[in-house]
């Protein structure tokens, strides 16, 4: 092992059993965690269909200790499974899936940058949290919130420019964003706070989990 540099499993036949077993285990844990999060009701956020789902931690583990391909596969499998208990919240499932994919890619990117640092995983998850908060807050303003409101019939168009204009004029919408009367300020305040808290929780679980997996599975991940 060279410092904190992670060596991925080589694509050899005798590693296939480990790949399948570990991926299946991570998928099962991700599904269970995602399901549990649906029963955790937090005032205000639950009314907006926002859940603090931290199942992505296990998808990230698969990306590092098996492969990116396997991780993307179980991410899609987890998303499809979520439709069983989220049949009326298609946009919510797609949003969580998008957040999971961005988390996987950001952790891979920042691991390449910080792999030689002493507290590697802390830096990886810290910058992933900040990047996700910025990306998803922006997407919520431009795409996700307009689609969500259009899907449930709150607005007549998913065009974010028109939605922002209607929000600013109609005080009935202000409930969604802490009573703030400006669409973009409301988007920033709500979703930056939500995403920082959510991915902060992901980091709190992700750092010790990744360090534990790194410790106990390292020998199996070394390419000899």
UniProtKB/Swiss-Prot annotation:
The keyword Ion transport does not apply. The keyword NAD does not apply. It is found in: Cell membrane. It comes from the Bacteria. Its main location: membrane. NCBIfam families: memb_MPN527. It comes from Mycoplasma genitalium (strain ATCC 33530 / DSM 19775 / NCTC 10195 / G37). This is Uncharacterized protein MG350.1. One of its GO terms (cellular component) is plasma membrane. It is a multi-pass membrane protein. The chain crosses the membrane at residues 25-45, 54-74, 91-111, 119-139, 142-162, 174-194. Keywords: Cell membrane, Membrane, Transmembrane, Transmembrane helix.
